[in-house]
A protein has these predicted regions:
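Phosphate- and other anionic-substrate recognition elements at nucleic-acid/protein interfaces
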Residues: 1-152
């Protein structure tokens, strides 16, 4: 059994998700301020860190992207185990078979993977599915985890 810690990094906050490769399911997740995520790396139990990596797409970038890159470096430095950098176009291609996919397409591909449909994949409070409670950037962290797990 391998546990992946997947990160969708940001310039001030990052989403993290623990993913059990034996069951193919996320076990816990949150979006927290980067300093909290950094200290969490000292206590969280996982076999490998997988991080969505920033890449150049030929467009001008601002300070937020550079700040995110700094945080990625800090996360890697703090983590004392194996890690992989996963690029967003690779996630898109793996989950949707096109690099032109948007976040909504990736989310739907994940729902289809855990479904069929939202009722099974996400569920309701009374009947939660494996993705119940997953919100916002945690979906991106799940996409990174699934892509990394399938590539292993």
């Amino acid at each position: 059994m391998t546990i992946l810690l997947a990160l969708d990094p940001g310039n001030t906050e990052s989403a993290w998700l623990l993913y059990d490769t034996a069951t193919g399911r996320p076990t816990s997740w949150a979006k927290e301020p980067n300093p909290f995520v950094l200290t969490r790396l000292d206590t969280i139990t996982a076999d490998e860190l997988v991080i969505e990596m920033v890449a150049s797409y030929g467009m001008a970038v601002g300070a937020e992207i550079f700040d995110t890159c700094v945080w990625i470096g800090r996360f890697i430095e703090r983590w004392h185990g194996p890690y992989r950098l996963i690029y967003r176009p690779d996630v898109k291609l793996h989950l949707t078979q096109t690099r032109r996919a948007k976040d909504a397409n990736i989310r739907q591909a994940l729902i289809d993977r855990y479904g069929p449909g939202k009722a099974v994949a996400i569920g309701l409070k009374a009947t939660p599915g494996p993705l119940y409670g997953l919100t916002g950037d945690c979906w991106s962290a799940l996409a990174v985890a699934v892509t990394a797990a399938d590539a292993a």
